[in-house]
């Protein structure tokens, strides 16, 4: 049963500054996400924007379901690309514990087209 949804759209050019500022990049993305995005060649900005949008989408989807304050950073929400091309969440720390305690299933899709990246999350139990 669907419990909640979340959606986020972001302008890809917002991530130009991330490529020049490693600290900024590492504040929002795990090392694995950075390495995966770098392998995209010319699509590195789209990849980063899509991952960021996915993280924001998950927060939006979870916010109506959570009535307690939890401590998290966007690096606790990791976006993993699987060999077949699909993507999944790899959660860490308190947010992982919360999802497991609530017995939630997460579904994610990301799309990007030149100027924009969008992500959509479905939360089910």
Swiss-Prot record:
Subcellular location: Cytoplasm
Disulfide bonds listed in the record: none
GO MF annotation terms: holo-[acyl-carrier-protein] synthase activity; magnesium ion binding
Keyword terms, alphabetized: Cytoplasm, Fatty acid biosynthesis, Fatty acid metabolism, Lipid biosynthesis, Lipid metabolism, Magnesium, Metal-binding, Transferase
Named cofactor requirement(s): Mg(2+)
GO cellular component terms attached to this protein's record: cytoplasm
EC number: 2.7.8.7
Chief location category: cytoplasm
Pfam families for the chain: ACPS
Family: Belongs to the P-Pant transferase superfamily. AcpS family.
Protein name: Holo-[acyl-carrier-protein] synthase
Source organism (scientific name): Borrelia turicatae (strain 91E135)
